[in-house]
Design a protein with these regions (language model features):
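Conserved N-terminal beta1-alpha1 strand-loop-helix module at the mouth
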Residues: 1-90, 98-101, 109, 117, ...
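Active-site flanking residues adjacent to catalytic metal/cofactor-binding acidic residues
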Residues: 37-39, 143, 181-183
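A short helix->loop->beta-strand "cap" motif at the edges of active sites that frequently abuts
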Residues: 65, 88, 113-115, 170, ...
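Glycine-rich phosphate-binding active-site loops on the catalytic face of alpha/beta enzymes
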Residues: 91-99, 143-153, 196-216
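Classical nucleotidyltransferase
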Residues: 143-145, 157, 161, 166-171
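Alpha/beta catalytic cores of nucleotide-metabolism and tRNA/nucleoside-modifying enzymes
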Residues: 168, 172-181, 186-190, 194, ...
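Short, hydrophobic beta-strand segments that form beta-sheet elements in well-ordered domains
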Residues: 117-121, 179-182
Length: 222
């Protein structure tokens, strides 16, 4: 039985330094039928880059996008306390910098705040160590590259291993878990991973397509 596929457009690849161009790119995505946005937040410490604060969340909400915020920060609870008054639908964070207890408390806090909650894992993280936490997640993001920058090459071997592991965990303890792949996504990667993945996150590759609708249609056809 094939899985229903979704596509999230990663704002990390958008031209955020040029407001007009950024808005044009958003319009292009919206007109192509893509309703989901992946909104990376980076502190420059958890990953070697800095990205988005809250500046675009209200506009994305007004435009009708479903927004998944992804914290790549060392203090996710502090960031959530700031972000929680802004409109978005889902939130994931990297659990590696904090204790498992604090990660569990944050997952519960996110859900209590009315959002879907998830964890995002770096390629070399041992997923089995986070099995008990995954039970409390609505979704999990598997990174196909080292997080921080867009346009990287897909890490095939380790990512396939992680996708198999997270699917095994899903079957065992959380059958409704949504599995998301973020990083290195292209047509070949989608074909290779389609039986493991529900949602693909694409930025650089998506914006390179002359017709973004073709990528969306391709994902839904797999």
């Amino acid at each position: 039985m094939s899985r229903v596929k979704n596509l999230e457009a990663s704002l990390l690849a958008f031209d955020s330094k040029n407001t007009e161009h950024f808005k044009q790119q958003l319009k292009l995505i919206h007109n192509s039928g893509i309703q989901n946005i992946h909104y990376d937040v980076m502190d420059g410490k958890n990953v070697p880059n800095v990205a988005f604060g809250t500046e675009w969340l209200k506009e994305l909400y007004v435009d009708g996008f479903n927004v998944t915020v992804h914290f790549m920060v060392n203090k996710p609870r502090k960031y959530f306390n700031h972000f929680c008054t802004f409109p978005f639908n889902n939130l994931s964070f990297q659990p590696e910098p904090i204790s498992k207890l604090n990660a569990l408390l944050l997952l519960k806090k996110i859900r209590k705040n009315g959002r879907k909650c998830g964890l995002a894992f770096k390629p070399n993280t041992n997923l089995l160590k986070y099995k008990r936490l995954i039970k409390h997640c609505d979704f999990v993001t598997i990174m196909g590259v080292e997080p921080g920058f867009g346009g990287q090459e897909f890490l095939k071997d380790i990512t396939l291993k992680n996708l198999r592991t997270i699917n095994d965990i899903k079957k065992e303890i959380n059958p409704n878990l949504i599995i998301e792949l973020d990083g290195g996504v292209n047509f070949d990667v989608i074909k290779l991973t389609s039986k493991y993945v529900d949602t693909y996150v694409s930025g650089s590759f998506l914006l390179k397509q002359e017709k973004t609708q073709e990528l969306l249609d391709f994902i839904k056809s797999i």
